[in-house]
């Protein structure tokens, strides 16, 4: 309850105060809360164009008319991230049969993602959000991660409908947690 009141108070602050403040942590918190508040079920999905593991540009708009499952993951070649994406790999036929596209997104380089994709035989594209803009737009970024790393994607899952609206959103705060694969599959039906 207190968090909601605090968040509501933040949004009532005049925009000019934000423009003049030097407290970067406050600004980051404000923008994260604003993103999370605006990215609700039924809202338009933030559009993006990212470089794939095949070194090609891939845009969300390329998939208009299909459902899109976005899986954000912190880092390639780590245990839980591999489990997350291997679960999607092992169920790829289900999604493909429903005219749905799976995209994995992390802040790793496209070259790292290419090796990760090859070693795990993923049938879907892995996209590099190296500049961290898409992770931030979806409210799926850690400002502070393990070992002092900053700007790492949070584990998250989104389902985007054929008209590019968010119909499922799950952002996990604990990196070792996995998304609700059953709920994702249900939303794609």
Tell where the protein language model's regions lie, with residue ranges:
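Short linear motifs centered on Gly/Pro in flexible linkers and helix caps
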Residues: 4, 10-11, 19
């Amino acid at each position: 309850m207190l968090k909601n009141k605090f968040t509501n108070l933040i949004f009532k602050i005049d925009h000019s105060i934000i423009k003049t403040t030097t407290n970067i942590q406050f600004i980051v918190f404000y923008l994260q809360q604003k993103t999370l508040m605006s990215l609700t079920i039924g809202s338009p999905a933030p559009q993006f164009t990212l470089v794939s593991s095949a070194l090609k540009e891939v845009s969300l708009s390329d998939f208009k008319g299909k459902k899109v499952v976005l899986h954000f993951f912190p880092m390639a070649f780590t245990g839980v991230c591999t489990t997350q994406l291997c679960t999607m790999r092992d169920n790829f036929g289900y999604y493909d049969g429903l005219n749905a596209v799976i995209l994995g997104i992390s802040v790793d380089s496209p070259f790292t993602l290419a090796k990760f994709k090859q070693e795990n035989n993923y049938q879907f594209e892995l996209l590099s959000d190296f500049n961290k803009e898409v992770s931030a737009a979806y409210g799926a970024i850690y400002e502070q991660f393990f070992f002092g790393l900053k700007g790492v994607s949070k584990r998250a899952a989104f389902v985007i409908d054929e008209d590019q609206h968010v119909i499922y959103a799950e952002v996990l705060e604990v990196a070792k947690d996995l998304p609700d694969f059953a709920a994702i599959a249900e939303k794609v039906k």
